[in-house]
Amino acid sequence: MVRITKVHTGIGDRGTTVHLNGETVSKGDDRLEVVGCIDELNCLIGIVRMELKRMPETTLDGGPRTTVLAAQREFDKTLSHLQQEMFDLGAECSTTPDSIPDGMQVLSAESCERLVNEMDEWLEEVEPLSSFILPSGNPIV
């Protein structure tokens, strides 16, 4: 578990930041942009998890909403795991392959393959799409 003791550097903003490997780079650095995109994705996954937990678990007559319960049960664990992997990937992108610290979690080919397999399994349960769907109607989409 990472322990963060402060959230500022104390030296002000000079348009640069320091990667995990100690390298000072411009805040316009491509790797930093990638880390920011990964962080935003991680935040969105967190919002999906929150919205899943906020969905009513019972119908108006008090019966269970089995689809919601199943989604909460199955997806929260998967999304939690994915969030941790995205956090690890962001850290990995904050350094170079030759300067990855000992013991640092890196995203493995097996992790990527597992995610692809999970997505394929989820797609087996839905009807094929005939067009793109615009996200709307519910905060979770």
Language model region names:
Residues 1-141:
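Phosphate/pyrophosphate-binding loop motifs in nucleotide- or prenyl diphosphate-using proteins
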